[in-house]
Amino acid sequence: MTVLINQTGACTTVPLALSTTTPTTLYTATQFDAVLGLRVTNTHSSAVVVTVELVRSATSYAIIDQSVAANTSIEGPDYLPMKEGDVLKVTLGSANPVDVVAVIMQGAGRNG
């Protein structure tokens, strides 16, 4: 699959420090945005299950659903296009501290 993006979109880094089992919004798309990178780091001494979901029109799609070992990181998709109103949510299986960082291209647009 070939994806062409509008290079005029602004990139931003979206950090989230999390230590609760409540689903937490990481990012809400305001237009045709794109996730260019996603990293989850477990800063605790015990493993934790991390779920990252794309929510579109009240339907959730798992992007990451994985146990992250103590003091390690995992990476998500290299490119994830989003529509206006799409939401990225993060949920932890236990209340251990986790850092999540996403790199977003705002207004990436689409072509094709």
Write out the residue ranges for each language-model feature.
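C-terminal interaction-tip segments
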Residues: 1-33, 37, 92-112
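Short solvent-exposed strand-capping/beta-turn motif centered on an Asx-Ser/Thr pair
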Residues: 40-45, 93
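Short, surface-exposed beta-strand/strand-loop-strand elements in extracellular ectodomains
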Residues: 45-66
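A short, sequence-level motif marking secondary-structure junctions
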Residues: 67-71, 106-107
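Beta-sandwich interaction modules
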Residues: 71-85
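Cysteine-clustered segments with highest specificity for TGF-beta superfamily mature ligands
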Residues: 86-92
